[in-house]
Amino acid sequence: MINIMFVCWGNICRSPMAEFVMKDLVEKRGLSSCFHIASSATSTEEIWNGVGNPVYPPAKKELAKHGISCEGKRAVQLTKADYEKYDYLIGMEGINIRYMNRITDGDPNGKFYKMMEFAGEGWKELMAGKRNMERAGDVADPWYTRDFSATWRDVSAGCEGLLEYVLVMEADKL
């Protein structure tokens, strides 16, 4: 089983979009039973009295335009225990990585990545050992841009590259 956690600030836009795009990609390849895919927030801003808000309606609508449902998803916060549970923890932007480090007390096993490290040919550079998290851009934040299609493009490119990377790196688990 390959365990992937996508992380953003509130877990109502970018990280749930990534969660459900990735689930869709692995399902289309017939690999759903080989993956556990989830998403979480670094903050509790979208969690009230222990209950997370649902996916932000425009993000949900963008997923639906591409035939993907995120029904039932509610915001949850990343925990220290998640570090041991997941093989890959994918932040949407640099500030997410910073807070992920705080929540989990660091990344001693090199499990943290920025989503855009995998986009385009990025996953091939990672395969070649050419990792540069600082160079990788951030996933467009639709909370501020209101451009959910730009976020869709970033998330899709990142998830496609991540899947290619994982299929090579984790071939023995498939």
What is the role of each PLM region?
Residues 52-56, 93, 159:
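A structural signal for well-ordered alpha-helical scaffolds and beta->alpha junctions
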Residues 88, 95-174:
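Phosphate-binding/catalytic loops
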Residues 8-11, 63, 90-91, 112, ...:
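Hydrophobic structural packing positions in well-ordered secondary structure
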Residues 1-85, 166-174:
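Conserved active-site segments centered on acidic
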